[in-house]
Amino acid sequence: MKVRYVGKSYGVDSMTDGKVYEVLEVDTMVGALRIVDDSGEDYLYHPKAPKPNGAKEAYGRYEIVEDDASGSLRKAIFG
């Protein structure tokens, strides 16, 4: 699964506007996407309001590039 982040760039350890990121899983227990970000590590990000840890406001949104057969990303982001 893959998403494109659209919004304010966070810096070298988070996400960059327009870049496509791999989503390792949709964690339904905590309601988050596990994404490999610019740091090269995987972190949990809110599916509807992506922001770096500790930030007070969301900076952007996701566009789905590639979903699984069950539509897991669509459900998490738009559902």
Predicted regions and their residues:
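Basic/aromatic-rich interaction segments and small domains that mediate binding to polyanionic partners
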Residues: 2-56
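Intrinsically disordered, low-complexity, charged/polar segments
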Residues: 43-79
